[in-house]
Amino acid sequence: MDFLLLGLCLHWLLRRPSGVVLCLLGACFQMLPAAPSGCPQLCRCEGRLLYCEALNLTEAPHNLSGLLGLSLRYNSLSELRAGQFTGLMQLTWLYLDHNHICSVQGDAFQKLRRVKELTLSSNQITQLANTTFRPMPNLRSVDLSYNKLQALAPDLFHGLRKLTTLHMRANAIQFVPVRIFQDCRSLKFLDIGYNQLKSLARNSFAGLFKLTELHLEHNDLVKVNFAHFPRLISLHSLCLRRNKVAIVVSSLDWVWNLEKMDLSGNEIEYMEPHVFETVPHLQSLQLDSNRLTYVEPRILNSWKSLTSITLAGNLWDCGRNVCALASWLSNFQGRYDGNLQCASPEYAQGEDVLDAVYAFHLCEEGAEPTSGHLLSAVTNRSDLGFPAGPATTLADDREGQPDSTPEPVTVALPGEHAENAVQIHKVVTGTMALIFSFLIVVLVLYVSWKCFPASLRQLRQCFVTQRRKQKQKQTMHQMAAMSAQEYYVDYKPNHIEGALVIINEYGSCTCHQQPARECEV
């Protein structure tokens, strides 16, 4: 069909006057994409891509057209003026990072409708007008990190329905306007970390139905309310580490699909008992380096899907309230840091939480109740693998409140059987170590005998020679001791034919020893 239409057009053109044909051909050539102009000096051209990087440029090259990509990074640009890129209507990406840009006029990106990626990071931009990104409705990625932005215009991201990635890390942003991301329905990654946020509005993140990862670390937030993240149904990762959060609450009863939450390095002292019931699919939780002293049993019961948790660096109170946490850790099948140290009372400071529970018998029957919790004995400890013996159960004493009453938590204490098992384990381990050492020595000797037989023969001869020398020395010492005794020895040689009176094992002789006599001089 296309060839048929082309043939009809050619046939029609051939019947027309030559002037009309030339005009039509000129119009067609004008509609074709313009080829890129000559490559500017010191720049690098790759087809329709232009790289003018690290050239100390103070303004963008002129008379550019037909480009698909332009990189002006690592230069000295200080301002983006209105209509500066009007000749680049086919541009799809623009890199302006690592310059000295401090001013961006509202219509600086006019006629750049096809741009999908814009990088303005590592500059000195202090503000952006509402109309800055209006000419670029096809943007997929915007990087504004490492600038000096202090405030965001309420409609800065209006109309960016295709935006998927937004970086605003390391600025000086103090507040996120309400519904500023309302039109960013395709946004999946948002980074506002390393700013100066002190609080969040309830609808700051409204409209982000496809957001999967949100970074708010290293800000100045003092309170986290899960109601600030309404209907983020696709959110899987939330990073809030290194803020100043003291309490974590949830004022809305709704469930979301969060799988990873980082609250480490804050100042958390209190968490509402029901706060984690809104995230039933949570798998990874970081709570290390906070000010927690204990964890409510209801919170522990809501950590059913966790596979990884960090709790070190908190101010754990190893009193009777620690029993619930100790029981939960004993049954936890996932990964945890295992460095939970007691901060109080004084006699348990520096001790591991689980060791303190067992060593100081913190959860035994007869302990006094504290903080509205009651300790009672339980005889069944098969779940923890210990023999039947004393144990304790932690239960909330509030009645008539089914939503806030936790399930009983059992803490098992090891008895004599457990101590005997530990001793047996030590003995077996020591025996195995000795056997292993002996086998290693035998193996070394065998390998040496196989690989260096001559050396072993020489070594054995040396040992034999040393033994002979030692025996000779002993014999000489004995003879010297015998010669020192003053004995009168009388001997009579045998004059038998063939007998020789020769000493030193060459003949035979007979000796008669007479009693010792005193001689007068």
Curated annotation (Swiss-Prot):
All copies of domain LRRCT, residue ranges: 314-365
Pfam families per record: LRR_8
Positions annotated as LRR repeat: 64-87, 89-111, 112-135, 136-159, 161-183, 184-207, 209-231, 233-255, 256-278, 280-302
Subcellular location: Cell membrane; Postsynaptic cell membrane
Domain of life: Eukaryota
Glycosylation, residue list: 56, 63, 130, 380
Record keywords, A-Z: Cell membrane, Glycoprotein, Leucine-rich repeat, Membrane, Postsynaptic cell membrane, Repeat, Signal, Synapse, Transmembrane, Transmembrane helix
Residue ranges that the UniProt entry lists as topological domain Extracellular: 35-426
Coiled-coil residue spans: none
InterPro entries: Leu-rich_rpt (IPR001611), Leu-rich_rpt_typical-subtyp (IPR003591), LRFN (IPR050467), LRR_dom_sf (IPR032675)
GO CC, alphabetical: endoplasmic reticulum; extracellular matrix; extracellular space; GABA-ergic synapse; growth cone; postsynaptic specialization membrane
Membrane topology recorded in Swiss-Prot or TrEMBL: Single-pass type I membrane protein
Cytoplasmic topological domain residue ranges: 448-521
Physiological role: Exhibits strong synaptogenic activity, restricted to excitatory presynaptic differentiation, acting at both pre- and postsynaptic level.
Family named by the database record: Belongs to the LRRTM family.
Protein name: Leucine-rich repeat transmembrane neuronal protein 1
Organism per entry: Bos taurus (Bovine)
